[in-house]
């Protein structure tokens, strides 16, 4: 089960006391999974050896995402120390949460009381590695900033609010300093390094052809667009397929799909 952090009883505390409470909760959680590669063995060069090639550009550690999505991302995952904006169909956010916690890392979800944790579990999420703050109080950005110190992935629901650029820059700097990744959704956040948008584009498995699917939706196709600073926009089609005991991600580029206005109208 996920860990729920209730801040309602802290309303009488000062801002400093609330922050200290969150930090104590972080210290009680397991440490992050290390991403740093093992150091390379030393190499001894003789006097006649050719000069070594220039050192390659430093590769940033990333948090894992569904394999089908990784092909669309410039670094194959979500770079640590960055802020990512996610919008549209909620399945994309759930898939990222599943990949991160399924790999042994920890996540916190702030201000999203209706997040579909059952769907995340079916995608492979380990809910015992998820801390929930459904009601962060009047300043969810401050709560997120504190949780960046100790949590691999922090998901922040902004509830439609717009974060001032100066405040956003301060949180970006903190994420970079702590090596954590912040996902923001349901609001405006200027300065995100990546912006991911997912929209439902079709379905598979209903009653077509020999009663395929026997009247049940077996797959949902998503159109995903990736944009960001110094990143050429990319688009792709992903599919979520029911396997009987879970949900799997795959590429829908070769799948046959068609539009369904009813499915398009379903809430994300």
Task: List the predicted regions and their residue ranges.
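A generic local secondary-structure boundary/capping motif
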Residues: 144-145, 171-172, 183, 208-214
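Detector for small/aliphatic-rich hydrophobic stretches
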Residues: 1-84, 89-90, 94-102, 106-109, ...
């Amino acid at each position: 089960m996920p860990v729920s952090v209730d801040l309602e009883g802290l309303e009488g505390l000062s801002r400093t006391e609330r922050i200290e409470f969150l930090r104590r909760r972080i210290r009680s959680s397991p440490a992050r999974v290390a991403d740093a590669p093992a150091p390379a063995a030393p190499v001894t060069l003789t006097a006649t050896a050719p000069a070594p090639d220039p050192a390659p550009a430093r590769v940033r550690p990333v948090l894992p995402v569904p394999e089908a999505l990784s092909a669309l991302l410039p670094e194959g995952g979500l770079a640590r120390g960055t802020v990512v904006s996610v919008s549209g169909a909620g399945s994309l956010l759930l898939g990222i949460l599943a990949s991160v916690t399924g790999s042994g890392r920890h996540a916190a979800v702030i201000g999203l009381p209706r997040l579909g944790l059952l769907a995340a579990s079916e995608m492979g999420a380990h809910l015992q590695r998820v801390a929930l703050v459904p009601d962060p109080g009047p300043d969810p950005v401050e709560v997120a900033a504190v949780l960046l110190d100790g949590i691999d992935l922090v998901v922040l629901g902004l509830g439609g609010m717009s974060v001032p650029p100066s405040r956003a820059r301060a949180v970006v700097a903190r994420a970079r300093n702590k090596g954590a990744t912040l996902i923001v959704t349901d609001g405006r956040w200027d300065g995100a390094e990546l912006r991911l948008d997912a929209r439902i584009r079709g379905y598979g498995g209903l009653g077509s052809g020999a009663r395929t699917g026997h009247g049940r939706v077996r797959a949902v196709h998503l159109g995903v667009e990736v944009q960001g600073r110094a990143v050429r926009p990319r688009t792709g089609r992903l599919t979520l397929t029911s396997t009987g005991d879970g949900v799997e991600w795959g590429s829908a580029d070769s799948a046959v799909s068609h539009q369904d206005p009813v499915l398009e109208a379903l809430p994300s």
